[in-house]
Amino acid sequence: FRNKKGRKETFQADYRIKRRTRKTAYSSISLPDMINQDCYPFTFVHRSRNCGQGILYVDIYRFKSTKSNLTYLVRVERYEHNMYAVKFYQKNHRLSPKKYQILSHTYEARRIIYTCMNVMFSVYKENPRASFGFIGANCEGENEADTKRYRVYRKIVATQISEEQFIHTRNKEKSASTISNLL
């Protein structure tokens, strides 16, 4: 196709320009160990209040995988004492009670987790006192202790989030981990 100046361009070249711009925008944010490579752009969808069970509000973010063309939702639950729980699942599984346990089989877990961590860092930018928690859900037939997902999340979090600003607490029996802010 031709652009406004009459120059010939391809969709691929246009995509690279947008992607480069997106990366530059992320790199200007000064957060601890900000991940700006190998992740998808995300958008804020909405905030729900009065969710019960000690949850003050829930923020929903959305991103789309360019590899598998699947849409994912990231659920960030805000609790008292600046505690946030970050969860994600495929949009087409949103009504399933096992939405956190279903595997996508797209082999892009790292990129999806990095995107969720960028959502987490955007929450941290809004609230510098934020602490985070996550649970690695068990797959069908897997024990709830020390799940495969938990081990992957724990490894990525340990390499990406500094222990100088956050205390890392792990519970293998529950496959749970918290990242407590030192502020």
Residue locations for each model-derived region?
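Non-catalytic substrate-recognition and accessory regions of acyl/acetyltransferase enzymes
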Residues: 1-183
